[in-house]
Amino acid sequence: MGKKVLAIDLDPQGNLSFSLGIDDEDAYTIYDVFKGNCDISDAVQKGGICDVIASNILLSGVELELTGVGREYILREQMETIRDEYDYIILDTPPALSVLTINAYTASDELVIPMLCEILSLQGIATPPSTKRW
């Protein structure tokens, strides 16, 4: 298809990183980007299918570590520096509303929210649109 794609794993479980064969050892991850340890471009790993910014379990504590004003815009500000390098940037988020998912919402142009065809899944999906007001 010839499109340049970046996948950013925002889930502390790191399933996207694992599924794409990306190792988070000895490499910067999205946690480092949030903590200001590196620029987002330093965390990009070249993959066979697409470029990836890996996650790791440290990301699970980022909610408590990021307390400053504007914490919901960290990802958007970092992505501005690399946005023109990619045709698509896919953000894989955890399945709960948190500082990570809010960062994904503020950084995104569009949302795709996969869900089970069940009433409880449908009720849970009602939160994001009303949450996004920026």
What do these predicted ranges mean?
Residues M1-W134:
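P-loop NTP-binding core
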